[in-house]
Amino acid sequence: MTNKNETGWNLESSYTVLPKSFFTEIPPTPVHSPELIKLNNSLAISLGFNPEELKKDAEIAILAGNTIPEGAHPLAQAYAGHQFGHFNVLGDGRALLIGEQITPSGERFDIQLKGSGPTPYSRRGDGRAALGPMLREYIISEAMYALDIPTTRSLAVVSTGEPIYRETKLPGAILTRVASSHIRVGTFQYAAARGSIEDLKALADYTIKRHYPEVESTENPYVALLQEVIKRQASLIAKWQLVGFIHGVMNTDNITISGETIDYGPCAFMDSYNQGTVFSSIDTQGRYAYGNQPYMAAWDLARLAESLIPILHEDEEEALKIAQDEISKFSVQYENNWFLGIKKKLGLFSNEEHDQSLIEKLLKAMEKYKADYTNTFRALTDNILENAPLFKSPEFKEWYELWQSRLERQKESKDDAYKLMKNNNPVIIPRNHRVEEALEAAVKDGDYSVMEKLLQALANPYEYSQEQADYCTPPVPSNRPYRTFCGT
């Protein structure tokens, strides 16, 4: 046990109020010789922890799953999911929710140990995780947070001192993941598949109380819950698209009810603009390609709506109609969010009839000339149009004149327009080749300085600094396309 007054542990376990079918209580499997690799000091402080205390051996033992803090009730959550379109009953196969940290401001966050050992849901897996993928999740999740995209976060990475075996022998690690909750679309699918309306209602009531208390007093809280989840996901997916983020594995078990991005396994950021961009080695059909993400989110949310049908209305036909009506609103909400965001990226405050055409012309030219997505928008922001093929093209020159004329017709000044662009066009993203470079140095050489420099550069993505310059260059074109794997 720890002294929570010194370290800051302030755990509750409200998830255990749900029926026992939703989880299995099980302790983490201890590891041989845990070592703290990375601690997120600023996140620790916001959660109410003393970072210096967390660096002590007794606390590292908690982050490794070797000891249990006061107030913890370790459990593996059960859920289901459509994985690449195929339904499976799943669950936390290598992660344990140890409790919910109540912050000094009264907020509640799940504290989950990822890689903490086997559970009843492990499906023949060893329940462990490798150091490289855990560091990768740390880097990407914190970059997403800095980009102002709702996301789970990473509190710490601890090496276990034990090897794990995949294609080769790899160093083991445990990630401490922080989330508003780990309730997923797949959690509702799991409840619906079991056929108990009481259990489904219990999950919905718990979710409303935890995430959407404002809908408790509405005429139909379950319809309102569906509406709120759709609204948050429409906002989230638009934010992904606007920075060129490709999740890679948008299965229903990776769609959170809170609207946070979760699971950074095969994700990556787009370099040259292409709607068909795919990085995941297992997405051979391009199901989760960049341009498909809004459609797949709608598909996933339709699975949530299906799961809720038994409690949306007592008449099944009416419930089905409600579900269909609500899901049909996603595309409009997404388009509105994306359109507003892309206009900000171009410094547009007002609406004009031909704005959609203006935006489409730029994106079409970017795709034709394989323009770097992030750097193109930043070049427009900084008004430094250098020797990229796009900027020399007749299509771009024509578009640029139209855009400048459009800016001049606004009542806001061009200076205001460029300020708006600066706040919406990042200088830096976690470039895939730079992330791999940092991971290789860390895992192969035990050199964490490359990762630290990358994290520092990613911390303020909208503010240019000299330290960021080296991280803004796209990868050199190669015959081997970049591929990601489900290591996390």
UniProtKB/Swiss-Prot annotation:
Chain sites annotated for binding ATP: G91, G93, R94, K114, D126, G127, R177, R184, D263
Domain of life, per lineage: Bacteria
InterPro entries noted in UniProt: SelO
Keywords: ATP-binding, Magnesium, Manganese, Metal-binding, Nucleotide-binding, Nucleotidyltransferase, Transferase
Cofactor(s) needed for function: Mg(2+); Mn(2+)
Reaction(s) catalysed (UniProt annotation): L-seryl-[protein] + ATP = 3-O-(5'-adenylyl)-L-seryl-[protein] + diphosphate; L-threonyl-[protein] + ATP = 3-O-(5'-adenylyl)-L-threonyl-[protein] + diphosphate; L-tyrosyl-[protein] + ATP = O-(5'-adenylyl)-L-tyrosyl-[protein] + diphosphate; L-histidyl-[protein] + UTP = N(tele)-(5'-uridylyl)-L-histidyl-[protein] + diphosphate
Gene Ontology MF term list: AMPylase activity; ATP binding; magnesium ion binding
Residues annotated as binding Mg(2+): N254, D263
EC number(s) given by UniProt: 2.7.7.-, 2.7.7.108
Pfam families named among the record's database cross-references: SelO
Active-site residues, Swiss-Prot/TrEMBL: D253 (proton acceptor)
Family: Belongs to the SELO family.
Role description: Nucleotidyltransferase involved in the post-translational modification of proteins. It can catalyze the addition of adenosine monophosphate (AMP) or uridine monophosphate (UMP) to a protein, resulting in modifications known as AMPylation and UMPylation.
Protein name as annotated: Protein nucleotidyltransferase YdiU
Record organism: Bacillus mycoides (strain KBAB4) (Bacillus weihenstephanensis)
